[in-house]
A protein has these predicted regions:
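Non-catalytic cap/lid and distal C-terminal segments of serine-dependent acyl enzymes
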Residues: 1-235
Length: 235
């Protein structure tokens, strides 16, 4: 079952749309309630609607008995800017979970049933938010994640990314590198140092993707035991 929902967000100070896919009445046996829930974050330039319809999410939801919630990322790298009433990280990482559970009582409230994933920019957001809100998410899935957002944005070829995007979203490089909320690698260390249980991590990418060279070693050394799946190009 596919539903497009709208709810007022305190973090965004406005109404926000999100898409919900439930494993119910979709040609398969209905899944057992309450449903485990996956929050799927779009990449840069992609809308929630594109993700909801371009990928076979309804079939995956029905096959595996998992509800899927897809919000818009708004090219904001899931950062928080209260001065602009644009706290995308707070909205998606925490508030959207509360809103969706209240609107759809069939969703599980248990941490062990709550997952977050994303593609590219959404992969960065899933890692950053999953490691920040460790009490909410049990698993993180990353598809070609832009884990080193500073390297990606500051070294992007001309015309690929707006030149002022990194300072507008993250400030300077030092502020990004030192922030457990913005830098997923610092987020891993912060979670462990504070005694919080980091979510499990699964990562998927092509062999020629520009994933950070130290990502696997850092995650592995943190005892998160990441699972990595590499794909070769058929061309």
């Amino acid at each position: 079952m596919y539903i497009k929902a709208t709810a007022k967000s305190k973090a965004l100070m406005r109404g926000a749309d999100f898409h919900v896919i439930l494993p119910y009445h979709d040609g398969y046996p209905d899944a057992k309630r309450p449903y485990p829930t996956l929050y799927f974050l779009p990449g840069f330039s992609a809308s929630a609607e594109e993700i909801a319809f371009a990928l076979p999410l309804r079939q995956m939801s029905a096959l595996y008995g998992v509800a899927i919630v897809v919000p818009d990322g708004e090219n904001a790298f899931y950062t928080d800017h209260p001065e602009r009433a644009l706290c995308m990280g707070e909205y998606i990482g925490e508030e959207l979970v509360e809103i969706s559970r209240k609107m759809f009582p069939c969703l599980s409230h248990e941490r062990e049933d709550t997952f977050i994933c994303g593609i590219s920019m959404g992969g960065y957001g899933a890692a950053a938010l999953g490691l920040h809100y460790t009490e909410i998410y049990a698993k993180i899935a990353l598809f070609s994640p832009a884990l080193e957002a500073d390297t990606l944005l500051l070294n992007a070829p001309e015309g690929i990314m707006p030149p002022g995007l990194f300072p507008a979203l993250f400030g300077n490089r030092e502020a990004y590198a030192s922030s457990p909320r913005l830098n997923p690698f610092r987020g891993v260390r912060d979670a462990l140092d504070s005694g919080r249980m980091p979510p499990g991590v699964w990562m998927c990418c092509g062999e020629e993707d520009l994933i950070p060279a130290d990502a696997i070693s850092i995650l592995s050394s943190s005892m998160m035991q990441p699972k990595l799946l590499l794909f070769s190009s058929p061309v």
